């Protein structure tokens, strides 16, 4: 993202000097018009929470937080650190003002200096006074040249193959027993929550690519993982859809590295990849190589690591292998392709397993959670369009850790 900001500043404001801060104390005091710094350098110096960094000793004319939703946790070291930056003008740039709940929005307002007691019950006033919102449609109304080609989104609902269904039912029943045992024992609430989340993780992995679940069991038991010999309807559908468009570049957004490894091993085309382990310089090389690659190339991206801050307009096909917790995460991922500079229609397909006859699908339950978060965001922004940006199967009240427990009927 830092590289992208630097390139955009050079493009639109070439007369401004830019300093990319890398932790060197002398560089922070440069005479540059703009200093760009990663969030990580606001928190790494000093062992104690709240230790100042060289950035805190400067008085800035303006502080701008890109991807500002990163400070949504008020108890985090990052939130406390950015609030201590010295400036009279503060901006937050984000496409996700509400990530999980209304409290996220309150955190952003706190950074801006808006009292919490003023925020509650006054979201419309806050929006009118403090939020400048521009959607892609809004920009097109201002300047027709900024109108993007259409973006078509489809939830591809699939049935599990027989062998997948059998494994998922086993995982589901096992999760029931594990959760029931945890709540019978005198464990702490945090321990019980961890048990529930681990069961959910295993069920999600099982639905995406069963070998990930088997690998996790092997690691936990200290044994060699059982090899998955069955088929995967989700993976076979993904590969078939890619093969149907051999002259178009594709993005595949994944949740886990395990599925990325498998997908990469099965594709017979130029494949590029970004996950959480890929360093900055290699990311840039992967992006540039994908842009210069021949039609048919595929970019596999871990959605948490590359779902924001990338320009990949060369791709016209976007595949999401499983629902994310937050619909905004998926929207940001789609925005890597469907953004200014895109000249062709973009087609997005999200692969979701439907409920089994005897057991609910954790993926469909996550879709329900997406519906709730879309409603909260639309209420904060006073904009019903938010609800329709990503189609969801149904909406529900907020899902808590106990609701996740109830998914397993435990």
Predicted segments with their positions:
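Inter-lobe coupling linker of SF2 helicases/translocases
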Residues: 36-37, 41, 77-87, 110-216, ...
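Conserved Helicase C-terminal RecA-like lobe
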Residues: 144-164, 186-299, 303-310, 386-410
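Catalytic acidic motif of RecA-like/P-loop NTPases
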Residues: 40, 69-72, 97, 258, ...
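A short beta-strand element within the Helicase C-terminal
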Residues: 107, 310-323, 347-350
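Signature of the SF2 helicase/ATPase Hel1-core->accessory helical subdomain module
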Residues: 55-121
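SF2 helicase/translocase NTPase motor core
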Residues: 1-76, 116-117, 182-183, 233-235, ...
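A conserved SF2-helicase RecA2
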Residues: 325-334, 338-410
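SF2 helicase motor core recognition
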Residues: 101, 260-262, 299-316, 326-343
């Amino acid at each position: 993202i830092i590289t992208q900001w630097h390139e955009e500043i050079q493009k639109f404001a070439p007369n401004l000097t830019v300093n990319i801060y890398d932790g060197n104390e002398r560089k922070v005091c440069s005479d540059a018009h703009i200093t760009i710094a990663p969030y990580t350098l606001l928190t790494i110096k000093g062992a104690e929470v709240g230790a100042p960094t060289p950035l805190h000793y400067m008085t800035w004319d303006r502080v701008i937080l890109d991807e500002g939703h990163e400070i949504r946790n008020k108890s985090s070291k990052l939130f406390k650190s950015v609030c201590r930056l010295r400036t009279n003008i503060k901006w937050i740039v984000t496409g996700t003002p509400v990530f999980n709940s209304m409290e996220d929005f309150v955190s952003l307002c706190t950074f801006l200096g808006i009292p919490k007691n003023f925020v509650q019950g006054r979201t419309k006033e806050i929006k009118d006074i403090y939020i400048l919102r521009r959607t892609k449609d809004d920009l097109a109304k201002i300047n027709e040249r900024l109108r993007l080609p259409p973006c078509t989104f489809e939830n591809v609902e699939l049935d599990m193959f027989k062998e997948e269904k059998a494994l998922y039912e086993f995982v589901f029943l096992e999760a029931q027993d594990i959760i029931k045992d945890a709540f019978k024992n005198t464990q702490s609430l945090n321990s019980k929550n961890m048990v529930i989340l681990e069961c959910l993780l295993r069920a999600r992995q099982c639905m995406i690519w069963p070998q990930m679940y088997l690998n996790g069991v092997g690691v936990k038991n200290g044994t060699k993982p059982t090899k998955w010999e069955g088929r995967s309807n989700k993976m076979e559908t993904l590969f078939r859809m890619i093969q149907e468009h051999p002259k178009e570049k594709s993005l595949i957004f994944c949740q886990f590295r395990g599925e990325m490894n498998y997908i990469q091993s099965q594709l017979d085309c130029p494949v590029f990849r970004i996950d959480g382990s890929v360093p900055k310089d290699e990311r840039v090389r992967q992006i540039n190589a994908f842009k210069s690659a021949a039609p048919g190339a595929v970019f596999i991206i871990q959605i948490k690591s590359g779902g924001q801050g990338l320009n990949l307009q060369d791709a016209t096909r976007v595949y999401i292998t499983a629902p994310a917790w937050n619909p905004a995460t998926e929207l940001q991922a789609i925005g890597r392709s469907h953004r200014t500079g895109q000249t062709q229609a973009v087609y997005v397909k999200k692969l979701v397993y439907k409920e089994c006859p005897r057991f609910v699908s954790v993926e469909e339950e996550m879709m329900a959670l997406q519906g709730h978060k879309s409603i909260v965001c639309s209420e904060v922004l006073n904009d019903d369009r938010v609800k329709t940006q990503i189609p969801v199967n149904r909406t529900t009240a907020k899902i808590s850790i106990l609701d996740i427990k109830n998914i397993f009927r435990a």
